[in-house]
Amino acid sequence: MTTNSTASTQRSSTPFIILFVLGAIVLVGLLLLVSLRLAIWIGTLLLLTFIVLLAGRVFTGNWLGILIDERKKMSLSRFQTVLWSVLILSAFLAAAIANLLVANNATGALSISIPPELLGILGISVTSLAGAPLVLNSKKGPIDRNKGKEPSDMPRWSDMVKGDDVANANYLDLSKVQMFYFTIILVLAYGAALVAMFMLADHRHSTIGEFPALNATTVGLFGISNAGYLVYKAVPRVLPPDMSQAPAGQTTPADQTPAASSVSPDPQAPQTPA
């Protein structure tokens, strides 16, 4: 049954991958008419994204395998780290390639300053990636160890916004929801800033010397979001008592069934002659 579920997941993901590749080809072709540097970055971004997806497919059998943790669940911390890593690495590589076309030397092409605020965001993401498994392992019980091994517990996108414990696995985790929105909004906002950087730079004369800076307040909010995510994950939770079980000392109807008793014949009862 597990094999069938995995095969079904792979079949459902394949059409999206094909559409992604076709859309990427069309998009890069259109961007070549707008800005060469922007086209280089978008092409690099799509290439790195495809490599990440392909690695997941090769090593786990699932195109989204890089987002799946050891519990067979979609991990929000993995999702966040992958988004920031692909975004920043693709922009750095594209900027280096664009600079190389102008500077004609490797030293000048790699002279790109990355703002400390951006490094702080990457550090916060990696901290959440490393801290989430530590928190979960510290509170793991016998029931939690078996979670994710059943065919019905295949990875789903909803895993990134649902609780990690057995007690809240079917409920939305507010700490995950807020962190998901923070991540998406910041990635889109910084992606727009990178688009402006690549479009406004003069590809014939100037090189790209630094990435767009981030506000310290934004980094602080991002850090608070991730801290809340880890702290809420560390809170112990227990299942409510099973109401189907009878309280201690109370007998069930089966226990109240009278046992078969032997009734001695009444000595005054009339005897049937043989």
Residue ranges, per PLM feature:
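Membrane-proximal cytosolic segments adjacent to transmembrane helices
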Residues: 1-10, 64, 124-170, 222-274
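A cross-kingdom feature marking solvent-exposed beta-strand/loop segments within repeated
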Residues: 60-76, 94-118, 163-167, 197-217, ...
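Compositionally biased, low-complexity linear motifs
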Residues: 87-101, 144-148, 245
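Loop-to-transmembrane boundary segments
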Residues: 6-19, 72-87, 155-187
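Alpha-helix capping and helix-loop boundary segments enriched in small/acidic/polar residues
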Residues: 9-13, 114, 118, 148, ...
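Short, surface-exposed polybasic-aromatic patches that bind anionic ligands, especially phosphate groups
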Residues: 25-28, 33-41, 48-50, 99-108, ...
